[in-house]
């Protein structure tokens, strides 16, 4: 007995439907960095947004969980504790203070705490709390939001003299 055209057509449509419901093997893997960047309002001009790359966005996340209460004038929860501290800590975006410091100095003060570099003992050491990568992310964020903007030191020219 031969199947009729209607039966063949129904089987073909059923096969197409079943294959459409299966997993797609050619789907591109999700890119975890695709939406990882962020922005930060300029602390001196709220109409301006500073674009952050992935590393800087990770530093922002750390800043708002670990540093905001002493290194900003306000926090997501309200006023910060900054004005109650002596000496008053630098604002995280204060380029007039922080731009003059090297990345190594900032890494040391974050890792070892304020008293290790003759600053306030109120600044705790984060070397056991944050990874080295997280500390570098935090420094990258600091550099990104600095006002005036941070200018990396110029590298010296090559000492090689061509013939």
Predicted regions located by residue number:
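Bacterial N-terminal signal peptides that target proteins for export
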Residues: 1-8
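Sec-dependent N-terminal signal peptides
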Residues: 8-14
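C-terminal motif of bacterial Sec signal peptides marking the signal peptidase cleavage site
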Residues: 17-20
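Electrostatic cytochrome c docking/interface patches
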Residues: 25-62, 152, 158-163
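Periplasmic/extracellular electron-transfer cofactor-ligation site
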Residues: 25-26, 54, 60-88, 112-120, ...
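Mature, folded catalytic cores of secreted/periplasmic enzymes
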Residues: 48-50, 69-70, 80-85, 95-98, ...
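Sequence context surrounding c-type heme c attachment/ligation sites in exported
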Residues: 57-68, 101-105, 129-132, 154-156
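Extracytoplasmic electron-transfer domains, predominantly the class I c-type cytochrome c fold
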Residues: 84-143
């Amino acid at each position: 007995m031969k199947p009729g055209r209607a039966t063949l057509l129904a089987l073909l449509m059923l096969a197409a439907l079943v294959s459409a419901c299966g997993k797609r093997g050619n789907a591109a893997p999700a890119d975890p960095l695709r939406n990882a960047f962020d922005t930060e309002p300029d602390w001196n001009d709220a109409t301006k947004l500073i674009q952050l790359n992935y590393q800087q966005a990770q530093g922002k996340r750390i800043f708002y969980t670990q540093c905001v209460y002493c290194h900003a004038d306000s926090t997501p929860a309200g006023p910060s504790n900054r004005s109650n501290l002596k000496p008053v800590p630098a604002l995280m975006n204060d380029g007039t203070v922080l731009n003059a410091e090297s990345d190594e100095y900032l890494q040391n003060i974050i890792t070892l705490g304020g008293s290790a570099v003759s600053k306030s003992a109120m600044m705790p050491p984060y070397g056991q709390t944050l990874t080295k990568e997280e500390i570098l992310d935090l420094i990258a964020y600091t550099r990104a939001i600095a006002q005036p903007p941070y200018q990396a030191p110029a590298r010296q020219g090559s000492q090689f003299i061509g013939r």
